[in-house]
Amino acid sequence: WVGGITSLVAALMATQQNDIKKILAYSTLSQLGYMVMAVGLIAPEAGMFHLFTHAWFKALLFLGSGAVIYACHHEQDIWKMGGLLKKMPITAITFLIGTLSLTAVPFTSGFYSKENILIAAKDSPLLYIAVGVAALTTFYMFRLFFIAFLGKARDHGSKVAKEVPVVMWAPLALLTAAAIASPFFSQFFPTNGHVEVHAVPHFGDKLVLMSLGAFATGFVFAFLLYFGKDKEPISIPLFRNKFYLDIIYQRLVTVFQDAVAALVHFFDEFIIGGLLVDGATRSAQGVGNIFRRFAQNGSLSSYAYLMGLGAVLVIYFTVFAK
């Protein structure tokens, strides 16, 4: 449940973000929740398989977003982009393939690895969360693609954007191939008897139909809401502000943290430093001053008395101490 709820909450956050890197970051958090959910469903091999395939297409998407940011003069707001498919066709196509992999379109790596997680969840209520997250993933990724790569350029950066040099798009091409071919390495992921990791689609399976239905639902909603749009048609503050977790952290966690820090500072400053360290020093100095005043007072008789007392103590400890 921890993985499932994490996956759902992060996916909802991603639906209202405008920063291209934040969308992918919350998407990554959501997919990590997917993997943890698989582990909780006693299917760690399915989680590891999704981790393996996810590494390829998410690396493709992050590098693609970096290419877009570079071409748009460091602009990261997707609403200030637009029309990049014509200006950056290689980057746009590779980004689209990465999007298709993430959204589990058949014959891409994400389709096979997500199917294994759905199989693991088929007898659990988490199946509905998994399918819902799949629909949300399709929604926010095609929202990103429709806004940033289609339509018209909305800002100077996207108007002057051009395809990145070969040293930047060549890795995108390699990762695109890996995003498609990586499922065929599933034989290297041993099973434990609960879920069989496979790269062969089961198109007649109900779970596959649910997965395809989730993709279709997310795509249709993204198309209806964002295709050809120049501004945000809906605003959900709860999702846009990330369930106010940052504010909660600042108001509660930070206050508690500051209180504990103040207490520790007081203990260190006044107890350890003031009483123990400085107190011991002042005590030693005080005792030393007392003895100094008594022993070094300039009186010859006092010196003789102390010398005699010292001699008596030496004789006592030498002769009688044993």
PLM region descriptions:
Residues 58, 135-143, 214-234:
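Hydrophobic alpha-helical membrane-embedded segments
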Residues 102-107, 180-187, 223-224, 314-321:
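Alpha-helical transmembrane segments of multi-pass membrane proteins
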Residues 161-219:
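Hard-cation-handling environments
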Residues 49-52, 125-130, 205-210, 296-304:
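Membrane-entry segments of alpha-helical transmembrane domains in multi-pass membrane proteins
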Residues 98-102, 171-185, 257-266, 313:
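Hydrophobic alpha-helical membrane-insertion segments
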